[in-house]
Amino acid sequence: MKDIFIVEDDALIAMLLEDMLSDLGYRVCATAPDLERALAAAKDTEFDAAILDVSLAGRSSLPVAKLLDERGKPYLYATGYGSAPEGSTPSTLPVLRKPFQLSELEQAMKLLAEA
């Protein structure tokens, strides 16, 4: 699991996340700042796993999660809200609470790989 798709509406957080993932040996193969681009990339891009912001400019990323479920792609949520969005499929996938440290991201990625 090396190629990661990031869905994040805050450009600074997306860049920080990309840098952190690179430090951990992952490659970010795609990013999307809004729901429409996230859905398009989730359909058309090859990646191993995804990190989804729960809220994209006030819109839930749940449609992206459902598409990833259909494709069998693992993902985790990164959120300042503390939990996955309402309506999420119950799962053992980790939720990364913002703000997070490199060690927390590393642990979440390990859990994601094991899921």
PLM regions and their residue ranges:
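Two-component/phosphorelay signaling modules centered on CheY-like receiver
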Residues: A11-A30
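Conserved acidic carboxylate
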Residues: E8
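Acidic catalytic/metal-coordinating carboxylates
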Residues: G58-P63
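Hydrophobic/aromatic residues positioned on beta-strands within the core alpha/beta folds
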Residues: A78-T79
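Receiver (REC) domain switch/active-site region of two-component response regulators
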Residues: Q101
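Active-site residues of response regulator receiver
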Residues: D53
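Acidic, metal-coordinating helix/loop segments flanking the phosphotransfer/catalytic sites
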Residues: T31-A49
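A Lys-centered signature of the CheY-like receiver
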Residues: K98
